[in-house]
């Protein structure tokens, strides 16, 4: 049973009504409910009385150090069997972290902990790691995004990785580690005891100088399946170093996020070698890089190689034009593995969309999800898309948000969506403006086709 309440300011009467439920439900989520330290004594008592509780989320509540301490006291009850705890954005500081070692020692059932958006600082992180290293702690997933951590925190984190083979997922994005910190962290990641499967390091001050260490990590860790390095200035030099590790047989990476990493068409050459050789790689994001049409052509040529088994490609905001669309057409008609293509925020225009529609009308295309938001599509492009929706047998989701279409374009899409031959399940139309008459038709269509979601 689940109690899931979000974005509701709880009155005293409503709180009194909820307390018995908190004592009974297996999953309790009270996110952004205006909770403060005052409510935490009640929460402590309620969870002490609830041996069935396995998940507790109190995200985005101003609990403060004292309030979080009260909640953690409740969880230390011997009957507590909690497995997942989210205290994201709860105003927990270094001063409140002193209780964490004892809590982590006593909560041997806890597998997942979210502490994002709390200013723990390096001293708070040090206390957290003291508990994580304890043999009684069995935590597998930890999120520490936006926690005011610096390079000083990387040695305690590395020490945890060296002694905790059960540790599987680590989110450290948006902390100021910079080159020195990442170098230290990689020493822990390379340790034979570390069996991490997912690592997220978005916007951590990583540079090309760190990519040799990261290369060694991906080369030595067959367990690592997901690596997120987005919003770090790796550049083409860093990408080249990273790819030398990705190419090794020991690398089993499935998901690689390199958005906004200063990659150009030159860097695509190294990535293309990886795409051609690594059938294990399934998801690649290069969003926010200046690949341009030249880089897109190189990627598409690799996607046509039999060794490439990529399922999801993100090239959003990559300065692609209509000139890249014939290359993507070849991919869509011949590639049998690519299910998702994110091309939003590229000036493809109607001519580019018309070109893509040629491939989408092909009987053997397998694409399921297509993002074309903010691509300068007008009513004319909608006409081609509307025709394709009647013939395509694979596309399930289409995003056309923030384009230049009007009533006529939307009506053409709706006319196709009404037909039994159209199998689309979700159409996203954020920031598209139409008249009340069109709005009425949209809502009527949703009633006629309950399986269809139109998001606007």
Curated annotation (Swiss-Prot):
Q: Which Pfam families match?
A: LRR_6, LRR_RI_capping
Question: Can the keyword Cytoplasm be found in this entry's annotation?
Answer: yes
Tell where it localizes: Cytoplasm; Nucleus
Q: Which residues carry this modification: N-acetylmethionine?
A: 1
What are the disulfide bonds?
none
Q: Which UniProt keywords apply?
A: Acetylation, Cytoplasm, Leucine-rich repeat, Nucleus, Phosphoprotein, Repeat
Query: Which residues carry the post-translational modification Phosphoserine, per the record?
Result: 86
Which GO terms fall under molecular function for this chain's record?
Answer: ribonuclease inhibitor activity
Tissue specificity as recorded in UniProt: Brain, heart, lung, liver, spleen, testes and kidney; highest in the lung and lowest in the heart.
The UniProt entry, under InterPro entries, shows: Leu-rich_rpt (IPR001611), LRR_dom_sf (IPR032675), LRR_RI_cap (IPR041302), NLRP_innate_immun_reg (IPR050637)
List, in alphabetical order, the GO biological process terms annotated in this UniProt record.
Answer: cell migration; regulation of angiogenesis; regulation of Arp2/3 complex-mediated actin nucleation; tRNA stabilization
- Record-linked SUPFAM superfamilies: RNI-like
Is Transcription regulation tagged as a keyword?
A: no
* UniProt cross-references to CDD domains, sorted A to Z: LRR_RI (cd00116)
**Top-rank taxon, per record:** Eukaryota
**Positions of LRR repeats:** 15-43, 44-71, 72-100, 101-128, 129-157, 158-185, 186-214, 215-242, 243-271, 272-299, 300-328, 329-356, 357-385, 386-413, 414-442
What is one cellular component GO term in this UniProt entry?
Answer: lamellipodium
Its quaternary organisation is:
Forms high-affinity heterodimers with RNASE1, ANG and RNASE2.
- What's its job? Ribonuclease inhibitor which inhibits RNASE1, RNASE2 and angiogenin (ANG). May play a role in redox homeostasis. Required to inhibit the cytotoxic tRNA ribonuclease activity of ANG in the cytoplasm in absence of stress. Relocates to the nucleus in response to stress, relieving inhibition of ANG in the cytoplasm, and inhibiting the angiogenic activity of ANG in the nucleus.
What is recorded about the protein's domains?
Answer: The LRR domain forms a horseshoe-shaped structure that interacts tightly with target RNases via a large protein interaction surface on its interior side.
What name goes with this protein?
Answer: Ribonuclease inhibitor
Tell me the organism. Rattus norvegicus (Rat)
Gene from which the chain derives: Rnh1
């Amino acid at each position: 049973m689940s109690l899931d309440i979000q974005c509701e300011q709880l009155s005293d009467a409503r709180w009194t009504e909820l307390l018995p439920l908190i004592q009974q439900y297996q999953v309790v989520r009270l996110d952004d409910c205006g909770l403060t330290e005052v409510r935490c004594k009640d929460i402590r008592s309620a969870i002490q009385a609830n041996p069935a509780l396995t998940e507790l989320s109190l995200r985005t509540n101003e609990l403060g150090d004292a309030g979080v301490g009260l909640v953690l006291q409740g969880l230390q009850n011997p009957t507590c069997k909690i497995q997942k705890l989210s205290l994201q954005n709860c105003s927990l500081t270094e001063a409140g972290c002193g209780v964490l070692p004892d809590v982590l020692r006593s909560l041997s059932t806890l597998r997942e902990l979210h502490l994002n958006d709390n200013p723990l600082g390096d001293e708070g992180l040090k206390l957290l790691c003291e508990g994580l290293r304890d043999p009684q702690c069995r935590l597998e997933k930890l999120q520490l995004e936006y926690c005011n951590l610096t390079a000083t925190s990387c040695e305690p984190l590395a020490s945890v990785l060296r002694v905790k083979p059960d540790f599987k997922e680590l989110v450290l994005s948006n902390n100021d580690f910079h080159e020195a910190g990442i170098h230290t962290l990689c020493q822990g990641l390379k340790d034979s005891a570390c069996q991490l499967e997912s690592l997220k390091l978005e916007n951590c001050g990583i540079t090309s100088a760190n990519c040799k260490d990261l290369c060694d990590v991906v080369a030595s860790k067959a367990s690592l399946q997901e690596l997120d390095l987005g919003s770090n200035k790796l550049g083409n030099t860093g990408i080249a170093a990273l790819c030398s590790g990705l190419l090794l047989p020991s690398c089993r990476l499935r998901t690689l996020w390199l958005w906004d990493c200063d990659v150009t068409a030159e860097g695509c050459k190294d990535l293309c070698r990886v795409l051609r050789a690594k059938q294990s790689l399934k998801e690649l994001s290069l969003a926010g890089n200046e690949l341009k049409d030249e880089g897109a052509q190189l990627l598409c040529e690799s996607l046509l190689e039999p060794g490439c088994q990529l399922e999801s490609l993100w090239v959003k905001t990559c300065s692609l034009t209509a000139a890249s669309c014939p290359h993507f057409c070849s991919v869509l008609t011949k590639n049998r593995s690519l299910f998702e293509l994110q091309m939003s925020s590229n000036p493809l225009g109607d001519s580019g969309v018309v070109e893509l529609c040629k491939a989408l009308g092909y009987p053997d295309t397998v694409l399921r999800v297509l993002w074309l938001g903010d691509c300068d599509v007008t009513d004319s492009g909608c006409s081609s898309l509307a025709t394709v929706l009647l013939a395509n047998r694979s596309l399930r989701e289409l995003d056309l948000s923030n384009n230049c279409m009007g009533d006529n374009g939307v009506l053409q899409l709706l006319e196709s969506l009404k037909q039994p031959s159209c199998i689309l399940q979700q159409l996203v139309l954020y920031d598209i403006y139409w008249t009340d008459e069109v709005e009425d038709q949209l809502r009527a269509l949703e009633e006629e086709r309950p399986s269809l979601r139109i998001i606007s």
